[in-house]
């Protein structure tokens, strides 16, 4: 059984930066260091940071006054940021710069009184943070996920609209939603550059290229990782059976009966060590030749805050 590895896979620049911010804070400041929400959606990463003294919470009221708080890569609402400042919490912001770009788009729309339509998944922390950038009662911000949502959507002024999107969505599905928005609201404006980030695009392109070459695809990533779920869904849509796994312990021998080639990729918040453990497990199940499938080279790096360098 041949093992083909997708490229690029695993950590993106935003995830690297977020983890580095927590690690540097742990090195420099007295523990505990509080992190609002999982800094990235991966249990292996979170547990490693916990073992070093990071404390993960969901709400600011779980954090003592005058503590250090790190906002996760997914970003936070203006209300959360304001509350943290009110309580004199020392803030380090690990929000991905590409999420911050979307925040700025929403903030500009809010200031101008332009209604905003966000394409994203209800309940995802990135969506909650982005929705929370809009503060103009005279306008409004609306969340849509599907073409069907667009059909049901009513706005105040169809001639004064802006759309943006969560950064980790399916490229194809989002294009369909944007087409539906433009058909229903011809005057709608959008970002000059797509909001879906380079890493999401590249990892989906890598799955597109790999899916036809393998019988089964394993996606290493957490169940609550949006971009990892999109990779599994994309392979399924292409007719390749795909499984989303946390780590090698989830790999089942029955998946590979009569299989000639298995593909492996990883979501943007999954470390390479988990991929290597999956490869070891596949070799135990009869995998032999390991081949790196060529793909887009990524050289993007996001700097950590000056105080943590």
Curated annotation (Swiss-Prot):
Its cofactor is [4Fe-4S] cluster. Coiled coil: none annotated. [4Fe-4S] cluster binds at residues 12, 96, 197. (2E)-4-hydroxy-3-methylbut-2-enyl diphosphate binds at residues 41, 74, 124, 167, 225-227, 269. This is 4-hydroxy-3-methylbut-2-enyl diphosphate reductase. InterPro entries: LytB/IspH (IPR003451). Isopentenyl diphosphate binds at residues 41, 74, 124, 225-227, 269. It comes from Pseudoalteromonas translucida (strain TAC 125).
